[in-house]
C-alpha cells in the first residue's frame, strides 16, 4: 500500500511540475531511484547488480601506493573509467524514463 502511495505521489509531482514533460531528465538516487524503477518496470521487475565495494581492497595497497594516491588524485575519476551502471546513469547524472526502462526485465 505504501509503495502505491509513493508511486502516486511521484506521478503527481511529475504531472504538476511546470514546463516539465514525463521524459524530463532527473537525478534519482537511493530509494527514489528504486521507487522510480518499480513504477516504470511494474510487474516485470528490474535488473540491478550493485558494484563491489572497493574499500576492503584498499588495505591490500602498500603504504607507498596509498600515499601516491593521496598526492596525485585524479582530476576526474570518471575520465579514467567508463561506468554504465544505473547509479552512474541516474544518480550522478540526470536520466529520463526511457533510461529507466533499459533496466526493466
Curated annotation (Swiss-Prot):
Protein localization: Secreted
GO term, biological process aspect, one: glucose metabolic process
Subunit structure: Heterodimer of a B chain and an A chain linked by two disulfide bonds.
Origin: domain of life: Eukaryota
PANTHER family xref list: INSULIN, INSULIN/INSULIN GROWTH FACTOR
Propeptide position ranges: 53-82
Name of the gene encoding the protein in the UniProt record: ins
InterPro entries: Insulin, Insulin-like, Insulin-like_sf, Insulin_CS, Insulin_family
Disulfide bonds: 29-91, 41-104, 90-95
Name of the protein: Insulin
Gene Ontology terms: cellular component: extracellular space
Keywords: Carbohydrate metabolism, Cleavage on pair of basic residues, Disulfide bond, Glucose metabolism, Hormone, Secreted, Signal
Gene source species: Oncorhynchus keta
Molecular function, one GO term: hormone activity
Entry similarity comment: Belongs to the insulin family.
Function: Insulin decreases blood glucose concentration. It increases cell permeability to monosaccharides, amino acids and fatty acids. It accelerates glycolysis, the pentose phosphate cycle, and glycogen synthesis in liver.
Residues of the signal peptide: 1-22
Amino acid at each position: 500500500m505504501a509503495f502505491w502511495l509513493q508511486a502516486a505521489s511521484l506521478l503527481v509531482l511529475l504531472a504538476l511540475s511546470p514546463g516539465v514533460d514525463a521524459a524530463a531528465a532527473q537525478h534519482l538516487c537511493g530509494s527514489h531511484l528504486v521507487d522510480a524503477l518499480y513504477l516504470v518496470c511494474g510487474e516485470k521487475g528490474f535488473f540491478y547488480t550493485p558494484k563491489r565495494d572497493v574499500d576492503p581492497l584498499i588495505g591490500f595497497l602498500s603504504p607507498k601506493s596509498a600515499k601516491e594516491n593521496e598526492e596525485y588524485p585524479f582530476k576526474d575519476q570518471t575520465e579514467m573509467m567508463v561506468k554504465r551502471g544505473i547509479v552512474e546513469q541516474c544518480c550522478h547524472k540526470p536520466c529520463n524514463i526511457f533510461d529507466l526502462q533499459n533496466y526493466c526485465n
